[in-house]
Amino acid sequence: LPAGMGWYGALPRSEDSLPERHLGLMQAAEIDDLESRLDKLADELAKTGAGQLPPAVEFADATPPLIAPLLAGKRLAIARDAAYGFIYPANLETLRALGAELVFFSPIAGDSLPACDAVWLPGGYPELHGKALSQNQALWTALKAHVAIGKPLLAECGGLMSLFEQIIDKAGVSHNFGGILPGRAVMQKRLTALGMQIADLPEGQLSGHTFHYSKSETPLTPLLRARTPDGRDGEAIYRMLRSTASYVHIYFPSNPTAIAHLLS
């Protein structure tokens, strides 16, 4: 490190460490005593003296790029609960800047599909909620009808898994899911993919990342494959009518215009 630059790369081991599972830390809403744990960890950090911050720096206000309201008048239904919670705040900000009306629903709670022009099924942990999700047949029936009449659907990672006929969880238990795409997703004991992805879709180039412990088994031929920054083949991207599904978590600000075309 350059002279004068400190390093702080770890916290001391503590019984107050944050709990984790196969895709990393548990989500904040799942940890009842989160604030208390963070306070204790902050106290431990302060004791070391290694976390002293440098003097504050003032930055000029950044001018956000102008985004045309290409989704004005469109109503976008977004799954959001413990099974579908991997949502970048910047993605929601981009959708609002595009003019979309956002309506959230909870597949775990038994919600059916709200009236909408397009649907986004983000990533998460559907494999941990197989029983509740497999019982919500009203939702899957509505999604099938949504896709069949040519309305847009974007499914990412856990969203992709949910579109298959089955998800096989880590215990080997099979759960019936959407049946919108043929095949199944099977949980593995080890990480199956991790890293940045670039998707050159017909709507435009989009950037994102992949991080999952499942494998898909499907007879579908991908529309195309994403690529890694160094040019290697990445995740398969499937297209059925206006539905687009893959393991890639897309960062919407990377190309708002392409997102608007995907969802309109």
Predicted segments with their positions:
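Structural motif
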Residues: 12, 79-83, 248
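Phosphate-binding active sites in nucleotide-utilizing proteins
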Residues: 74-148
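Hydrophobic, well-ordered secondary-structure elements that form the walls
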Residues: 119, 156, 178, 211, ...
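Short acidic, glycine/serine/threonine-rich loops at helix termini
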Residues: 18-26, 89-91, 131, 165-166, ...
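Cysteine-nucleophile active-site neighborhood
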Residues: 126-198
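Internal gly/pro-rich beta-alpha loop/helix module
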Residues: 1-68
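C-terminal and late-domain segments of enzyme folds
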Residues: 47-48, 70-72, 84-94, 98-102, ...
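A short acidic, often aromatic-flanked loop/helix-cap motif at beta-alpha or helix-coil junctions
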Residues: 13-19, 110-113, 187-188, 216
